[in-house]
């Protein structure tokens, strides 16, 4: 994602480059923000019977947001507060921005919003991880998964219902290739990985171009084995999985070395004790007035911040503990 932050005018210019960038933009936008950009809207000048859809530059005051990970879409709704010269009758009406990769928008934040933490969130988006299309295959089942910085999504499951001889494997692998080709067109992964028992992936690699990762299992079990493996380590770091595992360990041996829930984390933040904080994305959206100043203070005291998706591997556990926890320095 390309971005510029004008701290004097409190304006953030953003150009999302990948669908994952839309998630980070969603995190940054709060109700009451001003969003500017080019958009398409039906316009009907006075005296004209029928309107037409035209491209115009306008600004809205945000009232609501709608982010869909699986559809790769971000919609921002609000009331028009600014419009380009020569366009009458639009100001004061409602409008929806559809934010898509390649389209620039501006976010104007309120004066009490900590811009320091904006840079931290944008850096998370900038630390681009490869998008992986994982084909986890064995002789009975193939599971297709899509792995990004936002988590793991199971896209499709295919079963080998034929005999386990060479001719049926040819049909099986040919069918797998067709699904792979379609998923590559749809998701545009950076890397395609073929994982499973050595003999199976060697045969499958004659049909599918991919990085081969031999492992004990294929199918759904193979997806989880791949996630636990070393190749997935960088994703685990970025998504906070390793930090959460450290948190659980420290909680079991020394309760005073961690903070649980907003009150404890805020108290530790005020004392400058935060080493790393894990915060649920839904808590940020539900209580921005509490969470953004907290994260800004963590950032100022050189603590690390991990934003965790509620539907991720550690999201459920984090939600059960109030949506925010921290590892403490002392």
UniProtKB/Swiss-Prot annotation:
UniProt keywords, alphabetically: Cytoplasm, Endonuclease, Hydrolase, Metal-binding, Nuclease
EC number: 3.1.-.-
Cofactor: a divalent metal cation
InterPro entries per record: eFR1_2_sf, eRF1_1_Pelota, eRF1_3, Pelota/DOM34_N, Pelota_arc, Ribosomal_eL30-like_sf, Transl-rel_pelota
Source organism superkingdom: Archaea
One cellular-component annotation, GO: cytoplasm
EC class of the enzyme, as a word: hydrolase
BP GO annotations: nonfunctional rRNA decay; nuclear-transcribed mRNA catabolic process, no-go decay; nuclear-transcribed mRNA catabolic process, non-stop decay; ribosome disassembly; RNA surveillance
Pfam families found in the cross-reference section: eRF1_1 (PF03463), eRF1_3 (PF03465)
One MF annotation (Gene Ontology) recorded for this entry: endonuclease activity
Cell compartments where the protein resides: Cytoplasm
Family matches, as HAMAP family: PelO
Domain comment (free text): The N-terminal domain has the RNA-binding Sm fold. It harbors the endoribonuclease activity.
Self-association state and partner proteins as the record states: Monomer.
Family: Belongs to the eukaryotic release factor 1 family. Pelota subfamily.
Described purpose of this protein according to its UniProt entry: May function in recognizing stalled ribosomes, interact with stem-loop structures in stalled mRNA molecules, and effect endonucleolytic cleavage of the mRNA. May play a role in the release non-functional ribosomes and degradation of damaged mRNAs. Has endoribonuclease activity.
PANTHER family per UniProt: PELOTA, PROTEIN PELOTA HOMOLOG
Name the UniProt record assigns to this protein: Protein pelota homolog
UniProt organism field: Pyrobaculum islandicum (strain DSM 4184 / JCM 9189 / GEO3)
């Amino acid at each position: 994602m390309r971005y510029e932050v004008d701290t004097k005018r409190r304006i953030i210019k953003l150009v999302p480059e990948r669908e994952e960038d839309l998630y980070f933009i969603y995190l940054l936008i709060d109700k009451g923000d001003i969003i500017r950009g080019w958009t398409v809207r039906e316009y009907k000048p006075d005296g004209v019977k029928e309107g037409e859809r035209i491209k115009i530059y306008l600004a809205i005051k945000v009232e609501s947001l709608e982010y869909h990970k699986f559809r790769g879409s971000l919609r921002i709704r609000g009331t028009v507060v600014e419009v380009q010269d020569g366009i009458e009758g639009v100001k004061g009406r409602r409008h929806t921005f559809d934010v898509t990769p390649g389209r620039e928008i501006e976010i104007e934040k309120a004066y009490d919003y900590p811009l320091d933490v904006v840079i931290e969130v944008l850096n998370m988006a900038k630390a681009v991880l490869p998008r992986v299309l994982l084909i986890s295959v064995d002789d009975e089942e193939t599971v297709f998964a899509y792995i990004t910085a936002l988590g793991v999504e199971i896209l499709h499951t295919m079963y080998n219902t034929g005999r386990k001889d060479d001719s049926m494997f040819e049909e099986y692998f040919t069918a797998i290739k067709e699904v792979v080709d379609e998923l590559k067109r749809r998701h545009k992964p950076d890397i395609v990985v073929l994982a499973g028992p050595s003999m199976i992936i060697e045969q499958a690699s004659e049909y599918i171009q991919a990085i081969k990762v031999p492992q004990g299992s294929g199918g759904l079990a193979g997806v989880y084995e791949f996630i636990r493996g070393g190749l997935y380590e960088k994703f685990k770091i970025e998504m906070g999985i390793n930090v959460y595992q450290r948190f659980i360990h420290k909680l079991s041996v020394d309760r005073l070395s961690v903070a649980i829930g907003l009150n404890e984390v805020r108290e530790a933040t005020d004392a400058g004790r935060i080493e790393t904080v894990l915060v649920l994305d839904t808590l940020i959206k539900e209580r921005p007035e509490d969470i953004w100043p907290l994260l800004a203070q963590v950032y100022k005291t050189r603590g690390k911040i991990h934003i965790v998706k509620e539907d991720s591997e550690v999201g459920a556990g984090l939600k059960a503990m109030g949506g925010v926890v921290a590892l403490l320095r002392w």
